């Protein structure tokens, strides 16, 4: 069985914002509607990593999404440093050596390591252009099996693949899905997308949502609406 998670905790809002001040303003607007935030490249490189500690101190959860991929020692030490921020989730690319190093670097910390299978902005043509012989579905499945064998805690995958992956990895691995777009939202640069309710029904444990919340006229109302969809899909 998947650990029970409150509906509100299953929404992760991506703070893809230009600086810490903008992120803090968004967090204040969202108030108690959001309990889980993601810090990615844009905010991290603008000095946003210390915000992870502040969010944890405020009782929030933090997903530091830097998709580590380097030589083993560098990945292991990077995981060690990110774990010290108090992050709940961190990401690595789903290459076997990278995943193995990340698990070793975690040590005794409680941080959960998520492996990114194939970016949700990629489709079959993108993989072919990059020289991959496998299509999206086959590559995602291969990486999911490898991740499970190496002790990875969760997978970042398209909601389109969630149901298939759940059958492969079982209930012990968390499925975290970006590419979430509420009905009527623009797809933007995402190609493999799904609504919140459909993603939960497909087996996703956590939904990562950025622009549909942070660029909404009323971000708090947008977040609440997504949580309502999650509740509806789980009752």
UniProtKB/Swiss-Prot annotation:
PROSITE patterns named among the record's database cross-references: OMPDECASE
Report what the protein is called: Orotidine 5'-phosphate decarboxylase
Residues given in the record as substrate binding sites: 16, 38, 65-74, 120, 181, 190, 210-211
Q: Write the Enzyme Commission number(s) for this entry.
A: 4.1.1.23
| InterPro entries tied to this protein | Aldolase_TIM, OMPdecase, OMPdecase_AS, OMPdecase_bac, OMPdeCOase_dom, RibuloseP-bd_barrel
Matching SUPFAM superfamilies: Ribulose-phoshate binding barrel
What family, per the record?
Answer: Belongs to the OMP decarboxylase family. Type 1 subfamily.
């Amino acid at each position: 069985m998947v650990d029970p998670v409150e509906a509100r905790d299953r929404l992760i809002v991506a703070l893809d914002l230009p600086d810490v001040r903008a992120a803090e303003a968004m967090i204040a607007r969202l108030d108690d509607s959001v309990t889980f935030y993601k810090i990615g490249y844009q905010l991290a490189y603008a000095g946003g990593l210390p915000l992870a500690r502040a969010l944890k101190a405020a009782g929030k959860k933090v997903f530091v999404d830097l998709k580590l991929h380097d030589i083993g020692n560098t990945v292991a030490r990077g995981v060690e440093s990110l774990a010290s921020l108090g992050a709940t989730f961190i990401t690595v690319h789903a290459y076997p050596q990278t995943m193995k190093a990340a698990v070793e670097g975690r040590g005794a910390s409680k941080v959960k390591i998520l492996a990114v299978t194939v970016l949700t902005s990629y489709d079959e043509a993108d993989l072919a252009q990059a020289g991959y012989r496998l299509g999206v579905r086959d590559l995602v499945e291969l990486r999911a099996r490898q991740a499970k064998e190496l002790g990875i805690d969760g997978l970042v995958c398209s909601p389109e693949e969630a149901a298939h992956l759940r059958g492969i990895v079982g209930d012990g691995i968390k499925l975290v899905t970006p590419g979430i777009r509420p009905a009527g939202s623009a797809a933007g640069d995402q190609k493999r997308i799904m609504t919140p309710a459909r993603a939960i029904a497909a087996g996703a444990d956590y939904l990562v949502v950025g622009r549909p919340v942070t660029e909404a006229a009323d971000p708090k109302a947008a977040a609440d609406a997504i949580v309502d969809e999650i509740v509806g899909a789980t009752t």
